[in-house]
Amino acid sequence: MSPGLLETNDYPTALRTFEWKALWELVDGTAERLNLAHECVDRHPPEAVALRIQKADGGREIHTFGALAAWSSRFAHWLEAQGVARGDRVAIMLDPSLAFYGALFGAVRRGAIAVPLFTLFGPDGLALRIDDCSPKILLVDREAERRQAEFPAVRVLAVDGSFEAALAEQPAEYAPATAADDLAVFQYTSGTTRALPEAVR
């Protein structure tokens, strides 16, 4: 019987006694039913701090796990209402914020694939990634009309006051139905050594 992963204090022991099946000790889910949004967000006390965000203008934001769980659950409900199915890609081109992390975990909660995109990508870099992942929805902070013209096959939405109001009408809890082998995130590499950056899945 190997020691629990959280009870091992040194690397040699952890390496010697490691078993893949022991990883299931660390999560609530099973191979048949596992959701990363639940594991990363819902398991924490709702009043505990989840996000500390330093803004470019010097401002700061602090958000709890409860707020993150509610935002992501409402977004998952909204995605379902918009016809976003399991395996569909949802591109998220937002500055660090509750909306960014809420959308990321909300897409995962729904069973869609979250695709975080850097807000300072130029036209060519963004087009390469959009063409590669073929998202059903692209969330942006601003310039939604221009992005829509650039990518007519993608539904482009600005996360603004009206969008937040629409989310507020959705329930604050969502029961995910995903498995351990479902894809959750496409994270594009920097692409410095190849024309098209590779999506780590």
Feature-to-residue mapping (PLM):
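Conserved pre-ATP/AMP-binding loop-to-beta segment of ANL
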Residues: 47-49, 158, 170-195
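Conserved AMP-binding/adenylate-forming core of the ANL superfamily
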Residues: 47, 51-105, 122-127, 201
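Surface-exposed loop/turn positions
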Residues: 88, 112, 181-182
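Conserved S/T- and glycine-rich ATP-binding loop of Class I adenylate-forming
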Residues: 90, 107, 138, 183, ...
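Structural core segment of the AMP-binding/adenylate-forming
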Residues: 3, 81, 105-168, 173-178
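N-lobe entry segment of adenylate-forming
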Residues: 1-63, 67-80, 153, 177
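Short coil/turn motifs that cap or connect alpha-helices
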Residues: 64, 85, 113, 195-196
